Amino acid sequence: MVVTFLQDLEVLQDALLNNLQKLSAISRRKESGESKHDNKDSFAAIANEHNDEEEEIEFEDLVNIIESKVSDFESVLKCSIVEMTYKYPELKLQWEKSPRYDQCDKLHIVKLDKQMNEDIYAQLVEELDFVLQFVDWFYCYRLKVKEILRQHHKRDLAWNDEKRDRAIKFHAVDYDKLHQGTSSSSSLTSTSMEKASTREKLLSKTKQLTNNLVRGNQILQSGILQSDLNLDELRAQTNSLTQIDDKYTQFETVFKKTADLVKVLENASHQEKRDVYLSLGFLLCCVSWVLWRRIFKLPVKLGLWLLFKFFKGILVTLGLVKSYAGSSSSLQAPSLVLNAPILATTTTSSATSVEPFASVSAVSSIQRAVDEAVDRIVSHDEL
């Protein structure tokens, strides 16, 4: 891309040189024409004024073309400098254009990291050398153009003064011819002296007015040059503001994309957090279930059975509930499930102290109920 900009600079350089040669040729032709006009009479000078006007129009057109080409050259040169800065991140350049045409421009190397590849560094140095050559040539070109314009302006002022002096002399001769009489020599002498004094006064007044006009013209020319410089600065600032606006637009797009990405990450983070909480809750439920089945289930059931047995004993003592000793094995099974070891010890002692009417079948049924209760406890003691 930098090579493309350098090629564009070479094309603009050739065009500017051609226009400068044409401008110099017109300036030299006008200078030689003025020297020839000095040797001719006033009538011949008036006859050649038409050619001078055409050359002046051509000169102004060339000046306008050169100004547009200079602006294009400056823009392309700035683009090449910016492109070099983007192409080589280790390099940072800053072009300082001189506010005056007689002061050289400056190209500051703000940052340069020499710790890079040798081939890349050599290419960078070569392109930087080309850019420096174009910067120096651009300064010399502007200086040459300003010098030609200043000489042209001086020649125009001198030519205007010369035309004015010739016109004054021509009218003075006509005035002498018209008012020449046939009076005596003394009257002619006095009249010629009076005419000479009048002519001198007229010349002095005319020169004074001319000087004032020249001074005003110089002020206007300086104002025009200053306006041109201000316009150039405004164009440069406009280009800079346009580039800054483009960069801010790119930054805004990047910030919007970043904000969208942050929102997506936040939503994903909330979802992951919710999943983690659900996983922890499920883990706590599983641990609680294992603790209940392995540790807390039997003590809780035993405590409830003892509590119910205690209140049942109180109710039986108070006579509110009747005790049925001859209940079936199916009704005694829940109590035998909880205190199977106690029944195992009490059955041997009760076998000797049982009433005479207890039969062997009742004892066997109780043992079967105890065995079934123990088997039920063992079979249900799992997750």
UniProtKB/Swiss-Prot annotation:
InterPro entries: Sec20 (IPR005606), Sec20_C (IPR056173). It is found in: Endoplasmic reticulum membrane. One of its GO terms (biological process) is retrograde vesicle-mediated transport, Golgi to endoplasmic reticulum. The keyword Transmembrane helix applies. One of its GO terms (molecular function) is SNAP receptor activity. O-glycosylated, but not N-glycosylated. CDD domains: SNARE_SEC20. Residues 1-275 are cytoplasmic. PANTHER family: BNIP1-RELATED, VESICLE TRANSPORT PROTEIN SEC20. Component of a SNARE complex consisting of UFE1, USE1, SEC20 and SEC22 or YKT6. Interacts with TIP20 through its cytoplasmic domain. Belongs to the SEC20 family. This is Protein transport protein SEC20. The gene is SEC20.
